[in-house]
Amino acid sequence: MDGSCDCIEPLWQADDLLVKYQYISDFFIALAYFSIPLELIYFVKKSAFFPYRWVLIQFGAFIVLCGATHLINLWTFAIYTKTIAVVLTVAKAATAVVSCITALMLVHIIPDLLNVKLRERFLKDKADELDREMGIIRTQEETGRHVHMLTHEIRSTLDRHTILRTTLVELGRTLALAECALWMPTRSGSALQLSHTIYNSAAIGSVVPINLPIVSKVFNSNRVVKIPHTSPLASITADKSRYVPPEVVAIRVPLLHLTNFQINDWPELSAKSFAVMVLMLPPDSAREWRPHERELVEVVADQVAVALSHAAILEESMRARDLLMEQNIALDAARREAEMAICARNDFLAVMNHEMRTPMRAIVSLSSLLLETNLSAEQRLMVETILKSSDLLATLTNDVLDVSKLENGSLELEIAPFNLHSTFTDVVNLIKPVAACKRLSVVVTLAPELPLHAIGDQKRLMQIILNVAGNSIKFTKEGHVSITASMARPDALRGPHEPDYHPVVSDGFFYLAVQVKDTGCGISPQDMPHTFRKFAHPENAGKWNSGSGLGLALSRRFVSLMEGNIWLESEGVGKGCTAMFFVKLGMPEKPNANLRRMAPHPLQPNQGAGGPDALSISIMDSNPRVPRVRYQSSV
């Protein structure tokens, strides 16, 4: 051979070395190709879910065929037969077919595999997001736990100072604060005063003007507000930071219902007042306020406001209870005094009643005995007047002295048939001597339709007429007094000042209307509402016309018992007065013989039964300065 040829001699020692290395390499390649499918089959069987099993089978077949070609290649390094060449050719052809099919399948599989990677990234992001949410949830749970604990501590008492002290201490312990303080409004409301701190590192009572911009900023927000560490509100500790200033926040605390709320003597505050809570983190640290810590402070501030409101309401309730107890004690003492006074009054009335009834019975008895003797008509009229006056005085004594009986409503009417005309005759006989002393004329007019007999309480009716007519005579210096009696019309039963009076007209009953009119001193509009009160005296009555002041009050009570109504009318002082009353009386079907015998003589105009000149009577006034007057008959 030519010396320039770069060929390897077949029998050269180097050829054997290369063949040897190729032989070994093909062997290990074939071994690796055969082991890879076994590993794939093993892990696929172990996998519970794998969507590309046919791809793995094709890929395994491709690897096996590749390994087979390398294995068959081991026999080609020496002289080999045609059979080996055929087998090698078939193996390579099969490998080519399988590799092409696998390559085509990978065109569809690779995008899916890429999507799997994207899904993996998406799931990883979702997992990270879930981790963050779980962290937030854990933080919220922790915050809620702290809020529940703080709320429990705050609401464990209803003392306002204890509430504030507990709030600051628990916040400082939960949030690891360097200091926590509360600024309260002063009495004037123009400044904030330091009232509570945790460690008392600042002077209690320090004052900050309320018109500072930072204070207005805190008041105008219901959230936590970050304030500079150099702010006057942040001057709650004496410790100064060397390197990093502390983080300081403030929040307003509404004073919802705090009256008498002040420092040591808490001033009265309106419902729109605010306190300021200041919270400071430790200085010289990299710690900052986190969102859940801010939320915790906001919730606690609201709880403190509610707790302070409840405490204030409780204190007000306790003050009201104490005041009520004092009033009850005073009322109980007054009740005991009133009971003692009532007992003393009843004892006095009982004694006076007994002492007045004893001589009254003697007068009635002697008058009754005199009526049984031979008397002239004039003497008999005088004795009858004495007897009736004594009987009426006994009735008046019973009513006036038994005040408790009148006040508790236990007074009852004595219903019986009586002669109605005779009642007016008796009234005239009683009042005409008094009118004659004052030279007053008394005119009595009885309507023709007025029945002769009626059913009711004659003594009470007579007492009403005497009280009203007696008042007219008492307050009239000159002129006349007229008494008019008739059956009342239904439309005239209501007085001008009694809109709530509703009379009931029924069969067998009628309303007696009595009008007493005088030309006396009259009643002023100011005195009109007080005329029916007990012990009431008109200002224009004068000291000579003073009396007990019970007449009209008793008359109104009797009129009410008789289902009637009474009122007064006057145009003013010096223009006279008109008294009008209605009482309900029964109408008897057949008057008995006694009533017929009691029928009086008809009253003549301007004259009562007997006339003024037919009497000789002594008249005594309740005023001791009025002299005794004796009116003697001129006949």
Swiss-Prot record:
Location(s) in or outside the cell: Endoplasmic reticulum membrane
Assigned EC number: 2.7.13.3
Cofactor(s), names only, from the UniProt record: Cu cation
Keywords: ATP-binding, Copper, Disulfide bond, Endoplasmic reticulum, Ethylene signaling pathway, Kinase, Membrane, Metal-binding, Nucleotide-binding, Phosphoprotein, Receptor, Transferase, Transmembrane, Transmembrane helix, Two-component regulatory system
Residues that bear Phosphohistidine: H354
Domain annotation Histidine kinase: ranges: 351-589
Official protein name in the record: Probable ethylene response sensor 2
Organism: Oryza sativa subsp. indica (Rice)
